[in-house]
């Protein structure tokens, strides 16, 4: 392993420059994209002791895999995202990839250089096998019988996608939030298959407060009369109310107090005459209207059982549990170089949690670059376009490309 290296960057411009970049010049998109569905018939053993005998994963790819298969980047998604990382979904021009500002030609993860893979995690509800899928043993939706999953289970399933493409080692595995946990797990469980690990706005384990938020959200779903013990599919209903409340709770944790104050403050939605309160329990403030809208929208496209499953996977993630709480020991198997990025107003996974990872890596002598970005947008900052944040990621991937002997010009010449 190379000698220890730390590049620390705490980027703190004035507040009026921290909004997402809205410049007129933008790199190109990867264009219109469609997923492929990969079926795996080899049983997948799970951390719970159960196994899945067969399953499908929805996958999108961008860019070109080189002859050496050395330029592949895996993007891992967070709770409610999917394989659709970049570009515009075929047949739905409004469906733009959740990280389209990060992945594409000339973007920080440059698809003129790298072959990028997005995978919808096992148990999710966007095409991969999950609770809403048919259980082959019963001919009915899995529902509550779908096995509980962990981040490590996802990594093992993702590794089979890499095998499908003949990729022995990723140039980088990258993710934000829960996606960052998956990237970290890759570096620990399959160290020989990860050259660089990019962990953004993440944590090595959830705090009691975060587990508490997840539990309140789950109880909102489970106690909804439409939940039916997780077998609501058979009743032709959905626990909309519980899922909407769960999303409202989660959404608050994704925003910072500063961001909410700027967006909503105490502005009333439709004040009575002369700005008086309406003295009732319907929507009074703009923030209430916004949260109700977000909750209702979410409940129309996301599966409630998937929400339970993924939040529990979040709770269970704790790689240092096996080493008596010693994170450095848990990370001692890692062979990758690391980039960690945190955001000052992220109170869901605050910068101190990223620093915990950095300190553990330095203790092991692992090369690590760390950037702490001063941004007002809270946890969601990792999804937004910010010139300083993107510059950090761009510079890191340019370094990866140089180390691999890849440049945009070289790729174009090879083509």
Curated annotation (Swiss-Prot):
The lineage of its organism: Bacteria, Pseudomonadati, Pseudomonadota, Betaproteobacteria, Burkholderiales. It is found in: Cytoplasm. Belongs to the AB hydrolase superfamily. MetX family. The record marks 348 as: Important for acyl-CoA specificity. The active site is at 177 (nucleophile), 346, 379. GO terms for molecular function: homoserine O-acetyltransferase activity; homoserine O-succinyltransferase activity. It comes from Bordetella avium (strain 197N). The keyword Cytoplasm applies. This is Homoserine O-succinyltransferase.
